[in-house]
């Protein structure tokens, strides 16, 4: 797909390019909080009526001159212009470049400084069931990016009775063998329409956090309600952005 929107946070001087579309089909995708049980995972609704040209993206960013540029939305690496835009942001704007969130399908992008990877599962069968893609692709990409010196962070949605403590522990053990200092975020599952899984309790989040801390040094967790997830600006002023290009 392509980028259809650029937002800007003046306080922290960063811009975000928003993509439409994804390569995974995770049934618990948070996009379903807005699109409903029949919504397509990773695809924002409604579909953008137009996409930004590369020239429009560059013109907008040249005016802003942000210190950091994030690429997000569904799975940002499916945007065909991503490599060109990452290079432009690094060479022309001298900005830090980061995949604000990604499923890890493609981290071999020249001029990319860092990425925040959302791992879906540890066990091979569950990973394939959730995403439709093999686990090895994502984990090998992460290891390779780490070896190349990218600044990486990781996260996992904790879903009791699906992506449970055994999945969390497998991932944390893997990360710790690369570096115990990789930032790791446990996201408490937010129930989406059409699935039977429950939001974890406060105690379950605490147990999951302590388990992760037995492997990693930099662990955080979030336990949002549906209302909080749909309005992140109330909790974090980094989400106070304005649309500067696109719709």
Where are these regions (language model features)?
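Short, hydrophobic beta-strand segments that form beta-sheet elements in well-ordered domains
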Residues: 17, 96-103, 218-222
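Generic structural hydrophobic/aromatic packing signal, biased to beta-strands
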Residues: 17-18, 26-29, 71, 115, ...
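Residues that define the transmembrane beta-barrel architecture of outer-membrane proteins
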Residues: 53-55
């Amino acid at each position: 797909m392509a980028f259809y929107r650029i937002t800007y946070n003046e306080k922290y001087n960063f811009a975000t390019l928003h993509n439409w579309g994804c390569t995974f089909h995770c049934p618990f995708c948070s996009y379903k909080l807005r699109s409903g049980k029949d919504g397509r995972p990773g695809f924002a609704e409604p579909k953008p009526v137009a996409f930004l040209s590369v020239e429009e993206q560059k013109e907008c960013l040249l005016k802003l001159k942000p210190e950091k540029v994030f690429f997000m939305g569904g799975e940002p690496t499916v945007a065909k212009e991503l490599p060109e835009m990452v290079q432009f942001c690094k060479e022309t704007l001298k900005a830090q470049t980061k995949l604000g969130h990604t499923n890890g399908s493609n981290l071999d992008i020249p001029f990319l400084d860092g990425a925040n990877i959302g791992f879906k599962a540890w066990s091979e069968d569950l990973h394939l069931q959730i995403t439709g893609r093999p686990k090895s692709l994502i984990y090998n990409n992460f290891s390779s990016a780490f070896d190349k010196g990218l600044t990486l962070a990781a996260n996992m949605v904790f879903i009791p009775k699906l992506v449970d403590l055994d999945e969390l522990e497998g991932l944390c053990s893997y990360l710790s063998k690369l570096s115990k200092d990789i930032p790791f975020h446990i996201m408490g599952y937010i129930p989406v329409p059409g699935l039977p899984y429950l939001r974890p309790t406060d105690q379950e989040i605490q147990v999951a956090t302590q388990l992760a801390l037995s492997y990693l040094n930099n662990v955080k967790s979030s336990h949002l309600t549906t209302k909080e997830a749909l309005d992140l600006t109330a909790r974090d002023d980094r989400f106070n952005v304005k649309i500067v290009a696109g719709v």
